[in-house]
Each structure stands twice: as structure tokens, then as C-alpha cells.
């Protein structure tokens, strides 16, 4: 018994000594202060545990209070520099491809495919990013997509019964919109079948990338294979149609097929897979949380209704929204901004240092990961007054923030700025217009937000809806 106790004491002393040596070595290297946590595991479990709750902030708050806004930690198997500092985040984003490169978990890389926009680098990424933006800019939305967005929103809302799972309905809308934009398909059995496979793919993003040990990942890989097979059929059929002289459609697939140096079917499929994820998951979550936050803030909901009822009063019974209507929704844009700030659908981005990098007096070693946390900045009271309160009126002020001008980054920044940011704003604005002018609603159950593996409500936000008398 005494010998066992002695061994435990000796082991504790040895572990403490090794920890002290490690801290001393890192201090001499000029690394930011922090803790690497337990061997191999690091602080991953603490992070996941916090983000599976409605209030994950303590994980960041405690470390910022102790170490400062840039600190060292160990996440998902790798030493990581965590930045809750807007200037550091901007530096990381702007130096994409120079000092830093994108770096994501193996599960995400495998499920998206090696030719996805997220994983492209250098000149190819620049070219494909520009191509993607050309199909989602203001001019394209105004001239081509606005009517499609409005039509698809109305099509889905017309099918609503008394009780709906809002997050599921929002996912249908955004998926159908993305499929239409990319491949010119209207809603139907094919798109709904594809969407259900996508649900499984997304569930596997933050799973252990070992099919033998992770059922979630295994199902995700199988679903990804089915998605790729379905998209390959579409690509091959479109190639045949164009070779036979069919009129070229004005969508992303047509642009990819017409590219000067040509893309293989596999490259096009990977590209489409990633764009479907990007346009589907994030925008649908923003829609759901905008409604949740508005429901919990009656004054904001009342002002939003007033703005949209003025637009509706100028229309005929059966009307379509136009670009000019979107541009006359100032308070709606305040709601959109505040939803993006509070919800933080994209909580941050991982990058990897391509060389030794010095910033703010600290050294980031080559090969180390950096996590630029948008969430930490957006919810920092040093940058936004009452930062953790949903307050869309703050965006009516000419001086929204109390800190530097680069603190609001819901769509990232630098060369990897989200190419669909304007399309997401328009889709949410149109959805809110049709919802508040066509329905009243109340929550069917209490529902909570969680933030891992993605931002979502636990129960998919069930609501009871009632059609308003003048709805068309």
C-alpha cells in the first residue's frame, strides 16, 4: 500500500516537473501564454463541453481574463493559438496564402472533397472564388435571383400547417434555392432526396474520421458517396446536352463546364458539394435564429412588421418582391446584422502558420494552428455595448462599435471572404418579409441554442403558425 502511494507521489512529481519544463521551453520560444492541457487531449473536451451548452462563453472568458486576448491552447489534437483579438484576426485573414493557409479537420476535408473551394489554394482558389462571387453579387441577384428567392420562399410557406419545425423548413428553402442557383433544378423529389443525404454528410463534419470507430462518420461517408453519384449524373447529362447543341443555362454548372482549361467531372462534383453545404447550412440557421431572437424581443418584431406591412400595402394581392423592395428594408438589415453578430453561425476559422510569424510581441511557430474567433470579438463588451443582448437598434447608429472598425466579421474576410454573403442577406430579408406579413406565430416548446458541432437549436425550433387574413 505504502509502495503504491510512493509510486503515485513519484509520478505526480515527475508529471509536474515535465509540465514545468514544457512551460519554460514555450516561454523561451516567445509563445503567447496559455495552457496545453492534458497530453494528446489538450483542452478539447473543455471546449466541446462548453459549446454543447447555451452559454459557451466561459471557456473563452476565463482564458482571456487569465492570459489575454491571444493565448495558447491545444485543440483537436494540435497546439493552437487562440485569438479573441480583432487586430490579430484581421492580420491572419489578410495574410491568407502568404503567412497562413486554411486548415480544417480531416473529417471535413474528406467529406467536402479535395477539389472543394474551401480546400483550394493559390491562383486556383482566387479564380474559383471570383467565379462564385460572380453568381452571387448584387447585379445577379437583382436581375436573375430575386424572383427565384421570393418564389421558393412562398412555395415552401404555402405548405405550412399549424405546427412546423422552423429549422427544417428553413433548410428546405435554402437547399432548394442553392440547387436552383447551381444547377437550375426546381423543388421536387430529387432535390429533397439529395437534401436528406446532406443532413448525414454535415453531421459527420466534426466526427472522428475513422469509419471503423465512428458510426456518424461512416454514415456521412456513405451519404457523401450517394450525393457525388447523383451530382455526377447531372454533370454528365449536362455535358451531353451542351455537346448536342442545347441552349446553355445561366447557372454555376454551365460556367464550370465552359471554363477555358476545363474541369473534370470529379472536380466539378467536389466544387458543387461544397457550395451546396455553404449555401444550405449557414443561411437556414440564420433564418431560424432571426425568428427566435425576434420572438424573444417583441419590440423589434413589432417594428419589423411595421416596415414590411408598409411595403405590402403598396402591392397588389398577388405580388412578387423586387430589388427596390429589398433596398427599402433598413430595419430588416439591422435585424440581419444583429442576428449575425449574436448567433455567430461561423464562430471562427482555423489557419496554419506557413512560416514562423511574429505578431503583438508573440511568436507563432511554423506548422502551428491559429483559431481566429469571430464569436469572441462579436460578444466582447469592449467592442459592443451590452454585447450579449440582442439589440438590432444598435445598427441604426453611425458608431455601432466601441472599438476598431474591423470587429464585425460574420462572413470572414481577406481572400476567403464568403462569396455568398449578399445572397444570404437577401434570402433572409425575403423570408422575414413573407413570414411577418403572412403569419403570426408562437413557440410550440421551449428550445435552447447549442454551438457544437454546429450552431443549432436542440429541438429545431418548433412553432405554432396562424395565417393572417390578408396573406396570399
From Swiss-Prot:
List the PROSITE patterns hit by this protein, alphabetically: CYTOCHROME_P450
Question: Which Gene Ontology MF annotations are present?
Answer: heme binding; iron ion binding; monooxygenase activity; oxidoreductase activity, acting on paired donors, with incorporation or reduction of molecular oxygen
Q: Could you tell me what this protein is called?
A: 3beta,22alpha-dihydroxysteroid 3-dehydrogenase
This protein's major location comes to: membrane
Which pathway or pathways does this protein act in?
Plant hormone biosynthesis; brassinosteroid biosynthesis
Localisation per UniProt entry: Membrane
Upper taxonomic lineage: Eukaryota, Viridiplantae, Streptophyta, Embryophyta, Tracheophyta
Q: How does it sit in the membrane?
A: Single-pass membrane protein
Q: Which GO terms describe its cellular component?
A: membrane
**Keywords recorded for this protein, A-Z:** Heme, Iron, Membrane, Metal-binding, Monooxygenase, Oxidoreductase, Transmembrane, Transmembrane helix
The text of the family note is:
Belongs to the cytochrome P450 family.
Amino acid at each position: 500500500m505504502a509502495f503504491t502511494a510512493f509510486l503515485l507521489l513519484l509520478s505526480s512529481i515527475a508529471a509536474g516537473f515535465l509540465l514545468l519544463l514544457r512551460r519554460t521551453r514555450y516561454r523561451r520560444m516567445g509563445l503567447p501564454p496559455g495552457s496545453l492541457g492534458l497530453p494528446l487531449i489538450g483542452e478539447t473536451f473543455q471546449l466541446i463541453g462548453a459549446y454543447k451548452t447555451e452559454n459557451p462563453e466561459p471557456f473563452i472568458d476565463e482564458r482571456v481574463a487569465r492570459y489575454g486576448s491571444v493565448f495558447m491552447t491545444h485543440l483537436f489534437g494540435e497546439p493552437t493559438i487562440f485569438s479573441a483579438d480583432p487586430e490579430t484576426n484581421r492580420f491572419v485573414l489578410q495574410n491568407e496564402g502568404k503567412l497562413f493557409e486554411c486548415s480544417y479537420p480531416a473529417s471535413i476535408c474528406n467529406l467536402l472533397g479535395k477539389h472543394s473551394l474551401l480546400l483550394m489554394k493559390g491562383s486556383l482558389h482566387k479564380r474559383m472564388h471570383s467565379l462564385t462571387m460572380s453568381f452571387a453579387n448584387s447585379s445577379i441577384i437583382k436581375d436573375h435571383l430575386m424572383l427565384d428567392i421570393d418564389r421558393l420562399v412562398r412555395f415552401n410557406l404555402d405548405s405550412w400547417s399549424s405546427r412546423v419545425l422552423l429549422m427544417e423548413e428553413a433548410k428546405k428553402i435554402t437547399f432548394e434555392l442553392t440547387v436552383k442557383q447551381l444547377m437550375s433544378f426546381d423543388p421536387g423529389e430529387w432535390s429533397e432526396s439529395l437534401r436528406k443525404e446532406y443532413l448525414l454528410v454535415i453531421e459527420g463534419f466534426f466526427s472522428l474520421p475513422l469509419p471503423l470507430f465512428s458510426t456518424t462518420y461512416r454514415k456521412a461517408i456513405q451519404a457523401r458517396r450517394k450525393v457525388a453519384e447523383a451530382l455526377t449524373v447531372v454533370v454528365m447529362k449536362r455535358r451531353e446536352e451542351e455537346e448536342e447543341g442545347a441552349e446553355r443555362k445561366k447557372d454555376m454548372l454551365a460556367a464550370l463546364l465552359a471554363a477555358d482549361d476545363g474541369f473534370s467531372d470529379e472536380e466539378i462534383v467536389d466544387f458543387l458539394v461544397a457550395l451546396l453545404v455553404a449555401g444550405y447550412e449557414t443561411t437556414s440557421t440564420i433564418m431560424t435564429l432571426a425568428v427566435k431572437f425576434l420572438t424573444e424581443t417583441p419590440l423589434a418584431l413589432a417594428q419589423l412588421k411595421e416596415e414590411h406591412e408598409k411595403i405590402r400595402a403598396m402591392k397588389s394581392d398577388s405580388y412578387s418582391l423586387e430589388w427596390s423592395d429589398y433596398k427599402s428594408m433598413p430595419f430588416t438589415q439591422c435585424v440581419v446584422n444583429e442576428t449575425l453578430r449574436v448567433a455567430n453561425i461561423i464562430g471562427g476559422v482555423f489557419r496554419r502558420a506557413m512560416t514562423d510569424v511574429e505578431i503583438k510581441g508573440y511568436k507563432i511557430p511554423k506548422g502551428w494552428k491559429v483559431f481566429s474567433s469571430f464569436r469572441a470579438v462579436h460578444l466582447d463588451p469592449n467592442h459592443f455595448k451590452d454585447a450579449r443582448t440582442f439589440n438590432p437598434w444598435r445598427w441604426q447608429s453611425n458608431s455601432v462599435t466601441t472599438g476598431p472598425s474591423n470587429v464585425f466579421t460574420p462572413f470572414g474576410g481577406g481572400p476567403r471572404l464568403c462569396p455568398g454573403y449578399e445572397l444570404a442577406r437577401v434570402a433572409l430579408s425575403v423570408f422575414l418579409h413573407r413570414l411577418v406579413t403572412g403569419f403570426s406565430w408562437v413557440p410550440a416548446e421551449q428550445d435552447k441554442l447549442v454551438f457544437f458541432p454546429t450552431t443549432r437549436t436542440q429541438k429545431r425550433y418548433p412553432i405554432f403558425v396562424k395565417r393572417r387574413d390578408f396573406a396570399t
